[in-house]
């Protein structure tokens, strides 16, 4: 017959101790009580909740909007001479200038503050 091996405990069980202080047992469960309060959403008894219903403004009156809304664009905001083509040409010129400066400048794009042109 095979005998069963004895199992060894992995950890030594701590024996309960007598309370030295009145609140010692309460301190041991404080973490669980905090978790429970958070889970319940800090429900307070009704005597601690303030009722503001008598102070609030009863109703707001809506102001009707005009039938014809104001225009978003007028003659001052739109120019007939502006076009995407002129914007693209200006952009191409700026990009070409930047490319030329990076190729010809020995420092590349690195500069000191006293070398910056404003």
UniProtKB/Swiss-Prot annotation:
Keyword Nucleus belongs to the record: yes
Subcellular localization, as worded in the UniProt entry: Cytoplasm; Nucleus
InterPro entries linked: RNR_inhibitor (IPR013900)
Main location: cytoplasm
Keywords noted in UniProt: Cytoplasm, Nucleus
Taxonomic superkingdom: Eukaryota
Keyword Nucleus recorded: yes
GO CC annotations on file: cytoplasm; nucleus
Biological role: Mediates the nuclear localization of the ribonucleotide reductase.
Family to which this protein belongs: Belongs to the DIF1/spd1 family.
UniProt name for this protein: Damage-regulated import facilitator 1
